[in-house]
Structure formats: C-alpha cells, structure tokens
Amino acid sequence: MLSSANSINVGRLVPQVVYYFAAYAQLLRAGAIEAGDAVEFCVPTGNFGDILAGYYAKRMGLPVAKLVVASDKNNVLADFLTTGVYDRNRPFFTTISPSMDILISSNLERMLYFLSDGDCELVAGLMEQLAQTGRYEVPAELLATIQSVFGCGWASEDEVRAAIKSCWDANGYVIDPHTACGYHVFEQVAPAVGAKARVLLSTASPYKFPRACCEALGLNVPEDDFEAMRVLEQATNTVAPAQLAELESKPVRFEDVCDVDEMASYVESAAKRMSTN
C-alpha cells in the first residue's frame, strides 16, 4: 500500500483527537477543572495537523476556549492567522524544529472548508491561487471566524533554545525544540477569555533532538547523536526511550535516495519488487 506518512493522511490525523479528550480527562481527575469548563490548548505545528485534530475535538463537543498555533521561524501560519494573507513566497529556514519547517500547511485547506461552512467554491479558489501565485487572502468575515477559534505566536531559534532552558530550570522537565516553540508562545500569549486551564501539547521526545537540547542546556554537544543522548541522560537524570537508544545498534533498513524527477519510476520499480515477494 502506498501512503503518505505525514498528517495530510487523515488516518494519522483523526487518532490525534484523543489527545485532547485525554488531557481534559486528566485535568478533571486532578481537580483542576470541573466538567464543562473550557480549556485552552497550545499546539506546536507546521502542517496544521495536530491542531486540526483539536478543532475536530471541539466540534465533537470538547469545551475548547482557544486553539493556539505555535510556529517556529517559518512563521507562515502565524502571519496568516494574524493578517488573513497566506503567502509562501518567503525564505525557507532550516531550524532545530525540523518537523515545523513547512511553507505550505496541507491541513489548512480542511480548516478553511469547515470554518467557511463548507464553501467548496471559495476553498477551491483559494487553493488555486496558492498553486498559481503562492499566496491567497481570505475574506475579512472568514478571518474573524478563524481568529475566534485560533490564536497564534512563533519563536525564533534563540527563543526556542531559551525556552528549553527555562522549562528545565523551572520544572526539571526537558522539552524538545518543537515543544519549546509552544512553551515560548504560551508565555507570550495572554490566556484566552473563559479558559479555566491551559494545556501545552508536548509533541516529541527531546531524545529525538539530543544535540539541540544539549546545546540549549549549556552542555557539551557531541557530534554523534547517540553520544549526545548519553550526555543528556547523565545531565538531566532522565532515560532515553529504548526505541531511540536501540537504533545505535540496529542495521540501516532503507538506503535508497532518489531525486524528485526519479520518484515515479522508483515507485513503479519498488511496487514490482513488492509484488514478487
């Protein structure tokens, strides 16, 4: 079966709805909220997938006060949610939060569909503008509707590193660079009106990005990722997930690299190989 691995695949996106209900249930058990209280969620995102799952949770009835988008230096989403103009015609930055290094957020189309009350003609027109010119602007009324549901903010590289250090110093909790974008944004954005609690979604293990975390914490930064994991373990008295640590001794399974113009022929040849196995 050929399938997309990222959140444009609704099969990966829909299960993420569970995060929001699970977080709400934890707050209830902790006595932090009462049933029916509204909660604000801050979500580090690039492809608008995880936070769209939060919007689905809201539509399912979860009391959500606001969904706050946290971007990295590639802040096309933050700009869009502020101005109503989506413009991918800008520099692309390679950051220490690579999963958010995106200039075209695939799932935004799904959000536009829902918040425009299913106006397929409008959404199709916007997507055509994006394909042809790299930008589009939503009507003012639609922007107001979007802003009533979504807040936003972004963090520079230095702010991401500072957030990792700040969270460790304040809480003894190590966060990865993506989560650090959200940590910074939550500190900068005022709580949503009516929110009884605020939740930051921690989106990845810091051990997936051990060198960036070591650097942010002022530790020795080995060139080797696995050595950096060990430095991080010793300094923070935490343990790397076994699934990551064991990769050091695992054989490399996939070594093929192909250019974009070779993709179609590669997929065809791979499919033929699979069909004979």
Predicted regions and their residues:
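PLP-dependent amino-acid enzyme catalytic core
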Residues: M1-N277
